[in-house]
Amino acid sequence: MEIRNVKGTKDYLPEEQVLRSKIKRACEDTFERYGCKPLETPTLNMYELMSYKYGGGDEILKEIYTLQDQGKRDLALRYDLTIPFAKVVAMNPNIRLPFKRYEIGKVFRDGPIKQGRFREFIQCDVDIVGVESVMAEAELMSMAFELFQTLNLEVTIQYNNRKLLNGILQAINIPTELTSDVILSLDKIEKIGIDGVRKDVLERGISEEMADTICNTVLSCLQLSIADFKEAFNNPLVADGVNELQQLQQYLIALGINENTIFNPFLARGLTMYTGTVYEIFLKDGSITSSIGSGGRYDNIIGAFRGDDMSYPTVGISFGLDVIYTALSQKETISSTADVFIIPLGTELQCLQIAQQLRSTTSLKIELELAGRKLKRALNYANKENIPYVLIIGEEEICTETVMLRNMKEGSEVKVPLSSLSNYL
């Protein structure tokens, strides 16, 4: 038998997982600072739920992992955390609104594999249900900037409004049944360019005349400000989209983050579920060209799940932990899981007690040499593990209630009283 991972999956060894855990903690801390509550949903779901018409459209349906249980029920692994969240709200009508939740968990997509993108990956999501105002979007965008500032990553956020985009297509007489196809093509304009968009819409069965109209419209829109779209397109959807975008922009200015955002009139986020604001997050340095976070407003999913066709205003944002890890691993030295490594020299029993005492009286992470290695080999291990401090404890140290403290970065040693050790670390 060949021992190997499934294509698109990866093992993360301890030195890698340290950084991934740091990212997860940063997400949790930031989310909770914004008043979000934790939630956990099943990885395994009914296929009917995950393939629901508001659940992402045909593109995402091709990437769903499906299976059957022993009762012949059609099941699916979740491809995001949004649909399971909407399910929870729909199943629990007594949840107090507004409800702000976060969830960090694995999702699965049988899609293309590229840098920072796998088929099993972790998403870190925040969603707010019960707020109609685009103030919710502004807060989520502000939260994103705070998170990436914590992680020392500089980002920009591109944003748009689906009402604006749908209204533009309506104004140039794109048939309703072709709107989704055109939006999927326009969403790729930064990757494939205007000629690529023309080719893509033609391949989707759109006439040459209509393709020319689409491309000419794109070119004319690129120089427009948000306010200009009302005059350029006499359409009520465009007007609604412009109003919401202008309100959002006012909040972004008030929060001091507008300069790090970019209005992109053809950003669509692909998925058919979005009803208003959409946004994507990109690294400023371009070291990873795909987005490292995204989201938007989806007001119709929960009502559709509940079957009452009521609007449940909902907006969310999602961060890809794996792609953030890829970005950080390119520039950050992997730190150790331990702050202090204790090496006993014939004093194993006493060192066991000292390690326990330090764990219970300080916040230090303590690792004890358990394998009985000689001093040189034990120091070499601590060096390779990037452990900053080593305590060397022999019989003399036990008798004098001291320890030999070695600073691994400086290579210096000093004998200090055990009782005041924390003052030296």
From Swiss-Prot:
Chief localisation class: cytoplasm
Statement: the UniProt record of this protein carries the keyword Ligase: yes
Keyword Secreted belongs to the record: no
EC number: 6.1.1.21
SUPFAM superfamilies attached to this UniProt entry: Class II aaRS ABD-related (SSF52954), Class II aaRS and biotin synthetases (SSF55681)
PANTHER family named among the record's database cross-references: HISTIDINE--TRNA LIGASE, HISTIDYL-TRNA SYNTHETASE
Classification of source organism: Bacteria, Bacillati, Bacillota, Bacilli, Bacillales
Protein name per UniProt: Histidine--tRNA ligase 1
GO biological process, one term: histidyl-tRNA aminoacylation
GO MF entry, a single one: transferase activity
Subunit description: Homodimer.
Family: Belongs to the class-II aminoacyl-tRNA synthetase family.
HAMAP family, per the entry: His_tRNA_synth
Subcellular localization: Cytoplasm
Gene3D superfamilies the UniProt entry points to: Anticodon-binding domain, Bira Bifunctional Protein, Domain 2
Catalysed reactions, as listed in the record: tRNA(His) + L-histidine + ATP = L-histidyl-tRNA(His) + AMP + diphosphate + H(+)
UniProt enzyme class: ligase
Keywords linked to the UniProt accession: Aminoacyl-tRNA synthetase, ATP-binding, Cytoplasm, Ligase, Nucleotide-binding, Protein biosynthesis
Cellular component GO terms, alphabetical: cytoplasm
Origin species: Bacillus anthracis
Entries under InterPro entries matching the protein: aa-tRNA-synth_II (IPR006195), aa-tRNA-synth_II/BPL/LPL (IPR045864), Anticodon-bd (IPR004154), Anticodon-bd_dom_sf (IPR036621), His-tRNA-ligase (IPR015807), HisRS-like_core (IPR041715), HisRS/HisZ (IPR004516), HisRS_anticodon (IPR033656)
